[in-house]
């Protein structure tokens, strides 16, 4: 009997519109070599029978910046949420609020750093229970808005020093299921902001696009808050120091 192990499932979305990107549009490299994951409806890419250990999946698509994600293959199936960011040839240039963020450390460019940017989405999503304890893998949530929250999707629980990044894998009624247990406790009414992962280039710069003027939280790899930015219409240029 032939057994196939699903090593990783990657869901790919357009980071500007939130729409699904079908796998047939993507060019994929795994650990530097071209690969062809199995594309499934709904923007899913399926990687099977990978050697145990760390891997890097790179994704390219016309109109978008190159994106990559690192994960470790093992006995369990890894669930990955990837957003492709608009590039120079992206079609909706006039509708964008642009951010160019320069990141420095010790006066030098902070190259190759992973940062999360989180901003309010079309739907307001908040914790709806008195307290969500650290170690809990589910949350009672309150959603308000015309559009359904992105599920599965990555979010920042905006909670000051207790802020953290989570992956919301399912939402049934008011109950949200998390990919991993909470690292920190959170109280009622803490907001869940849609979050996207970015990588600084060799000059310590990243570029992002948003649908409207907004407040953006800049976070480190684990969701620790580094800066808050207010974006206005048109081009926005900011510098932060780690």
Regions found by a protein language model. Name each.
Residues 44, 48-73, 215-236:
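A short, solvent-exposed loop/turn motif at the edges and junctions
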Residues 9-13, 98-104, 142-144:
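Short edge beta-strand/loop segments characteristic of extracellular beta-sandwich folds
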Residues 2-8, 94-98, 136-138:
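Short coil/turn motif common to extracellular beta-sandwich-like domains
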Residues 19-22, 29-49, 124-126, 130, ...:
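Short, acidic Ser/Thr/Gly-rich low-complexity loop/linker segments typical of extracellular
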Residues 118-185:
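Autoprocessing Asn-cyclization modules and mimics
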Residues 1-2, 72-95, 230-242:
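Extracellular beta-sheet/turn segments enriched in Thr/Pro/Gly and aliphatic residues
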Residues 44-49, 142-143, 179, 203-210, ...:
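Exposed aromatic-hydrophobic patches
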Residues 16-32, 98, 105-122, 212-213:
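Short, ordered, surface-exposed loop/turn motifs in non-cytosolic proteins
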């Amino acid at each position: 009997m032939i057994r196939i192990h699903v090593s990783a499932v990657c869901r790919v979305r357009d980071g500007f519109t939130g729409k699904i990107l079908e796998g047939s549009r993507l060019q994929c490299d795994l650990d530097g070599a071209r690969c062809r994951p199995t594309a499934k409806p709904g923007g899913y890419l399926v990687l099977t029978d990978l050697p145990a250990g760390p891997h890097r999946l790179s994704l390219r698509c016309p109109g978008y910046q190159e994106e990559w994600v690192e994960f470790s293959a093992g006995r369990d199936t890894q669930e990955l949420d990837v957003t492709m960011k608009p590039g120079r040839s992206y079609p909706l240039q006039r509708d964008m609020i642009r951010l160019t963020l320069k990141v420095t450390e010790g006066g030098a460019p902070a190259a190759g750093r992973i940062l999360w940017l989180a901003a309010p989405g079309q739907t307001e999503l908040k914790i709806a229970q008195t307290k969500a304890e650290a170690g809990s893998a589910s949350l009672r949530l309150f959603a308000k808005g015309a559009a359904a929250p992105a599920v599965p999707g990555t979010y920042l629980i905006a909670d000051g020093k207790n802020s953290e990044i989570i992956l919301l894998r399912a939402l049934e009624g008011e109950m949200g299921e998390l990919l991993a247990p909470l690292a920190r406790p959170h109280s009622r009414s803490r907001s869940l902001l849609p979050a996207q992962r970015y990588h600084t280039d060799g000059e310590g710069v990243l570029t992002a696009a948003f649908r409207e003027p907004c407040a953006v939280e800049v976070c480190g790899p684990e969701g620790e808050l580094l800066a808050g930015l207010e974006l206005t219409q048109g081009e926005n240029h900011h510098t932060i120091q780690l």
